[in-house]
Each structure stands twice: as C-alpha cells, then as structure tokens.
Amino acid sequence: MPLPKIGNLAPAFSLQNQQGDKVSLKDFKGKKNVVIYFYPKASTPGCTVQACGIRDSSAAFKMLNTVVLGISPDPIKRLQNFIDKQALNFDLLSDEDHSIADKYGAWGPKKFMGKEYDGILRSTFIVGKDGKLKAIMDKVKTKSHHDDVIDWIKVNL
C-alpha cells in the first residue's frame, strides 16, 4: 500500500472513539483542520506526556480551528480510562487491528530493549480543511509535540 503523500487526500477512516461513537475523517472536511497523531499505548509515560500537552493546549487548537484525534491500537475501555485519568478533552480512537495505522505508514518494525517487534511508529499527520495532507511529522518529541504542531499550523494553514 502506498504511503500518504503531502498534497494528496488523507487516507479516509472511520473508527470508534472512547465512547464507542464512530468518528470519520470526512466529518471535518470543509469545517476544521485535523491533527491525527498515532501513539503506542494509552497510560504509558511518553504517551501521557504527549496527550497532556495537547490537553493543555486545547485553547490554541480551538483558536486555529483545528481538532486533534489520537489513534492507538488500544481497546475502547482503555481509551476511556486514559481520558478519565488524565482529564483529556479530545477524542481518542481505537485502531485495534492497526489497519488505519497501516494506511498512514504508522505501523512497522520497532526495537525495544534489544527486541524487534511491529508496533505504532509515533507520528503525526496534519490534514487541512480541504481533506488534503499538509504535513507529516515522524520525529515526534512527546514533551514538545503540541507546541511543534501549533507552530506549524500557525505558519502554514
């Protein structure tokens, strides 16, 4: 499957959020910019830092007419627990079979403690109101992720 390219339409998806409601990329076309960020696992240290940075920057994202969607292979119940525990104010989507991560090139080989396995490659995709992919960030730093994304949107959208 070809990886998404900047300037092309972002790969479509429809996934369940933490409450079991379907959220589709097309829901935002013509209305809002969309930040899609793939993260490995809810309630782990790096993912918590990243999510809380986004939570704390919600006013900036709102001012930029941008919605943030986090996607992981976690089941819905784990997503809801993560939202409750961290008071997150944006949707997390469940991609248990990693089919959407595959479409975005966000699933692949990783190494941890000397072992190689397949998993989520922490990455972010910025989609404009026109539904086209505007940016791909694949070298994500969890502590500054929210600021990096906001700065990019301010300059480019």
Q: Where are the language model's segments positioned?
A:
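Chalcogenol-based redox active-site neighborhoods
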Residues: M1-L157
